[in-house]
Amino acid sequence: MSREQGPPTERTTHRVVAGDARELALPDDSVELVVTSPPYPMIDVWDETFAALEPAVGEALSAGDGDEAFERMHDVLADVWAEVARVLVPGGIACVNVGDATRSIDGRFGLYPNHAAVIERCRAVGLSPLPDVLWRKPGNSAAKFMGSGMLPPNAYVTLEHEYVLVLRNGGTRQPPSERRRRSAFFWEERNEWFSDVWTDLQGRDQALDSAVRERSAAFPFEMPYRLVNMYSVQGETVLDPFWGTGTTTLAAMASARSSVGYELEAELVADLADDLPAQARALAAARHRERLARHREFVRERRAEGSEPGYRSVAYEFPVMTKQERRLVLPSIEAVRRVDEGGDGDDGSSGDEGDHSQGGDHGQDGDHGRNGEGARFVVEHGRYGVEDE
């Protein structure tokens, strides 16, 4: 693939802020996409976190009032959704991965429908729900039988799915045409990604492979990677207000989008930031290699069926199904530099260089770095091509 056949090399910026997402120090209308997974209300591991943010949560739990605790937990999250609505551009998308909870409170077992509560509060701040995705997760066979086992009528259905809620801020938007074209996905990916049931994602205890095996994420890398490519274009900015282990940042880096993440636990940011460059490069290379290989296999299968795709990729010189795919280019990561005071990037350069991003940096210009310690990276992108495989 010649260098003239793809997009110009560009830089994206990525900032992680140790701060409270209920007060995002970001300008209005400054990010195009939000991809996140909040703490799940009524999952007991998050009780202490919610109670610290809202004492009424702890009081309700102590009183055995599960319904009141559920509402107060979602009131905490509602402040974040209000900020999400404020910083999203008109037509911007928010994707929220959330699961419902089952729990016994004061001797009474029941379902707490987190997905419905998130939708309700997002609608209240002006976000419009679109068709969502059910992420069906492999079930734990030991937990299949809840309640009375084999005896009716008191057994319970086992939850084996979570939701990816998709919400839009206003009407549709039209990014620049050239960026849309090079950010296209393959025809067969369109059919898979935009299905309303995903069964091909590994669950939360997934071990990351190769250079990132020692780290795990709140959700598998493929989820934010897929959503970033579905709902934004290269050079735009992605926000994750519940940064966690940084999987959305990794997906944005791999996809040539800028990103901002907020995380309450400063120690978590400090512990994970140094690993991001190596993780991003490994994940981007592996995922893009896989996408090209899967497309070539798809073409072989079509030809075996006597059907030849009608167009040809400019960058990769293989057949594609539609005219919209002709300018598709997968971005490479050429270098990652850490440019805050925290340390060096993976190419050994020091953190003394300014922001030279050619796109998507409008969400990075606020004073949100003042909210707390964090990390900032500049990523140089090229074109992932045949020579990289």
Feature annotation, model-predicted:
Residues 173-174, 306:
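Charge-rich, low-complexity intrinsically disordered segments
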Residues 175-180:
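Extended catalytic-interface subdomain
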